[in-house]
Amino acid sequence: MPHPDGDLDRRIELLTAQIIAARKAYYQENTSLMSDVEYDALEHELKDAEHAKGFSDRNSPSLTVGIAAQLNLFEPVKHIEPMLSLDNVFSLDQLHSWYEKTKKICPEGDQCTFVCELKIDGVGVSLRYANGYLISAATRGDGAIGEDITQNMLYVPSIPPRIALPGIFEIRGEAFIKRDEFDRINQLSLERSKQFANPRNFVSGCIRTKTPNMRYLESISFYAHGFTQVYGYTSGGMNLHSDITASGGVKTEIEHGMFSAYSRLSECKIPVNSYNRLCTNFSEIESYIENIRLNRQCVPYAIDGIVVKIDSLQKQALLGSTTKAPRWAVAYKFPSESTVTRLLDIEVSVGRTGRVTPYAVLQPIQLDGSEVSRATLHNQKVIGDKDLLIGDYVRIRKAGDIVPEVLCALPEKRDGSEVLFKMPSLCPSCGAELMPSKLGDIDLRCPNMQSCLVQLAGRLEYIGSRGVLDIAYLAEENAYALSHLRKFGKSAEVQLFKITIDDLVALEFMYKGNMRSPFRKKGDSFPGFEEPTKSAQDMVDSIERAKRSPLWKFLLALNIRHIGPASAKALADHFGSIESIINAKIDELLKVRSLGETIAISVHDWFRDPWRVELVNTWRSDGALFGD
């Protein structure tokens, strides 16, 4: 049944907000809000909805890539040509359809060749060389403007600071870490409260930081997968016929093809993947994919598919690109792999909004190149629907090759010792009685938002994140420590803008004293100095800067349930001040574009709690401007 226009508009706005939030988390906060499969499904649904509407905004996620660079942290770098994404296909039939359509660019009787490459699960990087010297390295950003990460990328051993090619080139490629290197670093990080979640997030965090860790950066690798030049061919072309022996290179006459260009780049010491293959028909492409699929675990780094490109640079130029992706390339995504392990226990965690989420404690097992020992189970209904008992053998997979997921139980392996799981009735953190937020809700929540220390620590961590108030070093460990500091404790959130250097010196994570840290192994300690660290000063400076954040970011910082970046911006634009939002009635909130009844009620009810109004008033009196 077709959507009424109003419903379709609201659905498009919701999908847009979800996709932008996921991109921001992925590209700026080095984390994942959802699996690749879930994200791809959102993008496909948005395209379908816009098609049904007969219109798409030029800034729609369906027509754009990445997310705007964080120019408050990094200098901007304008790419010579847009650094685009790739369209995805999820079956060989879809890939064959793309192949047949793309092959039509080739004249009758002219062989059309394709390059097959591994789709490495890393971070896209653009390297700019001028007359042989590396002058900048940048992230993808929004495809047009990226973030300057040159100083960090200079530590990556496989990136040459000088190459034997004249002129100005941008080399596009993937920064990644090999599995054994990632495992080695995680072994060296046992003193941390938690290890790095996955290789991709590790790489993103390493190259997108103002405080680089040389040891970590030296573990990162790079492979080139594209290039462009200020002059000569565009859309992936550079004049590789040039006689460059004067620059120390080897004179090589080649056709203007991607595969032969890779060979030329390799001669110039630019790393190129040895798994790249030239294919002359679809049967060869299919064989390549099957061979990689069967031997995927032999590849020393994480991959999630195969990229297929037309080889001819001239034909690439003829096919061109959309605003989001080239028409001459596509990514075939592998189905998620699965394996069997034991469900040892089911435990629960408490989130920043009070939601209590069960998760599976698994017999540790290797899956797709990394050890898996935990997987979310969402809620009691999911556990029941999947017929899970503690002690079961279960089949698991990585959804989107990242997030561990329990698919089902294997009841035929039961021996009678299995135990039924029941959600706890009390909060494991504060002891409050758990309950649904409203009649009919599946999720249980801890209603003690003001005093539950786990919720408080989660809110502080969220407040400090890059997408909210961007407070340096206010991450998980530090948020936990603040919420347990005797001076603040349960009022740490309210007193956030009162924090001083002296307060941070009292925290072990900011103090170079000989106190044992709760986040380190027994017996570990800090060196014996008694002055605040640079980290402490950076954090205090960040708190001061955060006072001048725009109103919509403060709305996020208040941790109002259901409020994301899109709805926060809509509220800020509509009302203009925090006081107007506090005093707004539900019918006034419903007039805000893209706000439905659920969000309107959530915002209205949030400001009816006296302690939350006190939070706003205290922040205001402590210098927070709320966008004024």
Curated annotation (Swiss-Prot):
Its EC number is 6.5.1.2. Keywords: DNA damage, DNA repair, DNA replication, Ligase, Magnesium, Manganese, Metal-binding, NAD, Zinc. Coiled coil: none annotated. One of its GO terms (molecular function) is DNA ligase (NAD+) activity. The keyword DNA damage applies. It comes from the Bacteria. Zn(2+) binds at C427, C430, C446, C452. The active site is at K119. SMART domains: LIGANc. Its cofactor is Mg(2+); Mn(2+). Belongs to the NAD-dependent DNA ligase family. LigA subfamily. This is DNA ligase. It comes from Tropheryma whipplei (strain TW08/27).
